[in-house]
A protein has these predicted regions:
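Beta-strand-rich interaction surfaces with strong enrichment in secreted/lumenal proteins
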Residues: 103-105, 235-239, 337-339, 349-354
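Extended extracellular/luminal ectodomain segments enriched in beta-structured repeat modules
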Residues: 63-64, 343-347, 354-363, 373
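C-terminal motif of bacterial Sec signal peptides marking the signal peptidase cleavage site
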Residues: 6-9
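Predominantly extracellular/luminal cell-surface or secreted proteins
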Residues: 86-88, 379-384
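Solvent-exposed strand-to-loop "edge" motifs in beta-rich extracellular domains
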Residues: 71, 119-121, 299-303, 353-357, ...
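Extracellular glycan-recognition surfaces and repeat-rich motifs
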Residues: 297-336
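OB-fold nucleic-acid-binding modules
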Residues: 11-80, 84-286
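Exposed beta-strand and adjacent loop surfaces of beta-rich binding modules
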Residues: 80-82, 216, 361, 373-377
Length: 384
């Protein structure tokens, strides 16, 4: 690795930020990122920024620049040849498609202020797949905005000698703000007072593979959930997900309609506090009554919204966060439990109290949608 010579040869688990000799490039921004958001096409097409003009007196080329702070890092392997930057005013950030490896060790660590030369770059503001302003090389058959080649990017991406602490530029927001995060798109965010969902906690970051490249697990504040996207190539992909509660930091991106946080390294998670049970058993007010007969059709319950509180029963999301809930199909009401879109395993119990000294027969109807195994079990629990 190019960074090996930057660290002490003795064994030490604390790593310093790489030190670089720096010559100030003496550049000044000429354009605002917000203005380029407005001018960039959103219909899937790409614009090539105009070539530089020439000073009529000196004949020197006149270039246009934007300035921003680096907020992504490929140190953890979760960003691959894609860098994110946040304008110095903290507004919506942008993505640069660039053929670079180990950028964090090449003077592009988070907090570094850089200049991006715009002339002859392609740019767009797609509203599907990866969302937000993106810059790169002109279109190819494979990409609408291609990667800037390795030998070319130093002409466009120019580091300054200025670097700030992440704490000076991070947006400390709530989970709800992240989910409606148009103002924070492609910026560095930190969300406190959250924990990984029951399905994710204790598993690995790569436990819920959504495709051959990425996994999606979720954090929650007890009311809402937010996607945490991890590449299978991240060096922490197989590490255990924390089971506590605390904060998480990363780049807030959007894929189609889904806002998601992409961590830079495992250090972006700090959850030392005790975990909260956000899905306790829902105990019905009459659940201690043991009738001699039970005839339940679920027709008396609400399906819009779907009811999970049953006065005569106990509904317990024992593993994961999914309860039994009331659904309707073809004017027929029933209860359903599914792990779909939960990000992990679920196990929910519906406790039905009944006096079996007078009742000696039990029957019910079932229907399995998207069958993938024998997942329904019936247990007798004796209570005295």
């Amino acid at each position: 690795m190019a960074a090996i010579g930057l660290f002490s040869s003795c064994v030490n688990d604390t790593y310093d930020t790489p030190k670089f000799d720096c010559v100030n490039p003496g550049l000044t921004k000429t354009k605002e990122v917000a203005a380029l958001y407005t001018s960039a096409p959103t219909n899937g097409t790409t614009v090539i920024y105009p070539a530089p003009t020439k000073d009529p007196v000196t004949g020197k080329e006149i270039f246009d620049y934007i300035e921003a702070y680096v907020i992504s890092s490929d140190e953890g392997g979760n960003f691959y040849k894609s860098m994110y930057f946040q304008p110095t005013d903290g507004s919506k950030g942008f993505n640069l498609s660039v053929d670079i490896s180990n950028a964090y060790a090449q003077n592009f660590q988070p907090g570094k202020k850089v200049f991006l030369k715009l002339n002859n770059l392609a740019y767009a503001n797609p509203t599907s797949f990866g969302r937000g302003l993106i810059f790169g090389a002109p279109p190819t058959e494979q990409y609408a905005v291609d990667r800037i080649p390795t030998l070319e990017y130093p002409k466009y991406l120019i580091p300054s000698c200025d670097i700030v602490s992440e704490d000076a530029i991070v947006h400390k927001i709530t989970l709800a703000q992240a989910l409606s995060g148009a103002n924070y798109l492609n910026t560095l965010v930190e969300i406190d007072d959250v924990q990984f969902t029951d399905e994710a906690a204790g598993g690995t970051y790569d436990s819920n593979r959504t495709d051959e490249y990425d996994s999606s697990i979720f954090i929650t504040d007890g009311a809402k959930t937010l996607t945490i996207r991890t590449s299978r190539f991240a060096n922490f992909a197989g590490h255990k997900v924390p089971t506590g509660k605390g904060k998480i930091r990363g780049v807030l991106t959007r894929y189609n309609s889904t806002y998601q946080i992409i961590m830079r390294t495992e250090r972006d998670v700090n959850m030392p506090n005790p975990r909260v049970d956000y899905t306790p058993a829902i105990i019905g007010t009459n659940s201690t009554v043991f009738p001699g007969t039970v005839n339940e059709t679920f027709e008396s319950y609400s399906s819009l919204p779907s009811q999970t509180n049953f006065p005569n029963y106990i509904n317990d999301a024992a593993v994961g966060s999914k309860y039994w809930w009331v659904k309707t199909f073809s004017s027929n009401k029933y209860i359903e439990m599914t792990s779909h879109n939960s990000g992990g395993a679920n196990n929910a119990y519906l406790f039905v109290p009944v006096n079996m000294t007078t009742a000696n027969n039990l029957s019910f109807k079932t229907n399995m949608g998207y069958w993938n195994g024998a997942v329904l079990n019936v247990y007798y629990v004796l209570a005295s």
